[in-house]
Amino acid sequence: MENTRASLMFKTLAVAAIGLSATFVMLVRDPSDTLFGGGYPELWRRTGLAGAPTRAAACIFAGVFLLAMGWLYRLLFAPLELLRGVDEVGYIAEDGRSRAQAANEVRRRRKTGELPPVYPNGWYRVLDSHMLERGDVKSVTVLGQQVAVFRGQDGKAYVVDAYCPHLGANLAVGGRVVGGCIECPFHGWQFRGVDGRCVKIPYADKVPEFAKVRCWPSCEINGLVLVWFHCDGLEPSWRVPEQSQITRGEWVYRGRTEHFINAHIEEIPENAADIAHLAHLHTPGIVSGVDLRYTNSKTWEFIRHDWKVEWKPEPEPNKHCSQMLVKHALTVFGRHWPLLDLDVLARQVGPGVVFLLFEHSFLGRGVIMHCVTPVEPLLQCVSHTIFYQSSIPPLVPKFILRAECIQFERDVMIWNNKTYISKPMLVKEDSAIQKHRRWFSQFYSENSPRLRYQHDTLDF
C-alpha cells in the first residue's frame, strides 16, 4: 500500500508538471523571456531562435527533466522488479547462436541422470499477493498443471484448475469474477472458489451435483499466494509460518526477482548444504558479475566475500524445516570491513519456501522469501521477494536484493548446465550434502510423479 500511494503521488505530480509546462509554453510568447529575464534572450532573437524554436526547446527541457525525475523516483522509491526469461541467464551463446538456441542445445544434449520424483509434496508459491487485485484472474502453470488464480470480491484468493469441466475453456483467459466465483467465458458457468462447485448454469434449470472444478488447497500469507500439493491428495500436514512484521506492516514490499531454472527442484535447496561451493563460486566480489568465465578476473580480485556456513535439519515437530546459518564478511585489498559483516538465518520450510532473515546494526532488518515452484518436471520458477523495515530508505533493501541476485545467477549458470548425479563422489567435508538428501526425501511418497525414459524421449 505504501508503494501504491507513493506511485500515485508521483503520477499526480508528473501530470501536474506536464500540464503546467504545456500551459506555460502555449501562453507565454517567448518562454526564454520568462525563464531568463529580458536581457539573456536577446542572443536568441539575434540568432533567430526566438518564438517557436524556444518553445520547442522548453518542451524538450521539460521532457528530459520529467524523464530524469522518473528515473530518480524509480531508483530511490519504486520497488526493484527484475524478471529473467527462461534462456536469459546461464547460457553461453557462441558460434553465432542466440541464447535461446544455446539453451535448447544444452537441454537437448544434457544427460538427465537417475532422478528423484519431480514434484515433492508441499506448499508452493503461485503469485505474490500484490499481483492479484480484487476481481483479477491470472493464468499460472504450476506442477505441470494450468490453474486459474483469482481474487473474489470478498478479497480472498482462490486457486482452481484452469479448464472448465464443461467443454474445456480456460477460465483464466476471458473468465471474470462474480462475487466469490469465477465465470467461464464460454458458456457462463460459475464455479465457487471455496470448493469448486458450479453454482450457476445460465441456460439450465438445475445445476447437477457432479458439476465442479478441482479446487486447490491454498492460503495467502506473508504477501504470497501458496498452493498445497500432495500426490495422494492428502490435506496439508504443516503450514508455512507467518512473518509477523509483514502482517503488521512494519516490513514493506521492496521488490522481487524471478528466474527460470532448467534443473530438478532438489538441486536448488541442496546448495544450502553444499558448503564448499560458497568459497569457490561466491567469493569473488559482486562487481565481477555473473558470467563464470570472468568472475575470477584479476581486475576485481581485491574485493572478496568470505563465508562461514552451517546447515542442519530441525527436530520434531518441525522436521519439515531446516536451517542454514551464514556469516558473511567483506574484505577490500585484504582489509576486513566489520561494519559490512552480515549474519543471515536461512530457514527452509518444506521443499519450496525459504526465509532469508537479515539483521544489521545500521542497515536494518528484513526478509527475502526464496520460493521454488516446479513449472514442469525439470523447469523451476524461482522468485525472491524482499520485505524490509519501512523506516530504512528503499535503496538499501534494493541493493541487498540486487547483490543477492548477482550471487544467485552464478548458481543459475551451474544449474542450467549440470546433470543430477544420484550417487555423487563425495569427500568427508561434503557430508552435509548426504544429510540434506536424506532430509529432503521426506517430501516424496510412493506415488510421487517421476520422469521416465521411453525410446530416448521423456514421458511424464
Swiss-Prot record:
Binds 1 [2Fe-2S] cluster per subunit. The chain crosses the membrane at residues 8-28, 60-80. Belongs to the cholesterol 7-desaturase family. It is an enzyme of class 1 (oxidoreductase). Residues 123-227 form the Rieske domain. One of its GO terms (cellular component) is cytoplasm. Keywords: 2Fe-2S, Iron, Iron-sulfur, Membrane, Metal-binding, Oxidoreductase, Transmembrane, Transmembrane helix. One of its GO terms (biological process) is cholesterol metabolic process. It is a multi-pass membrane protein. This is Cholesterol 7-desaturase nvd. It is found in: Membrane.
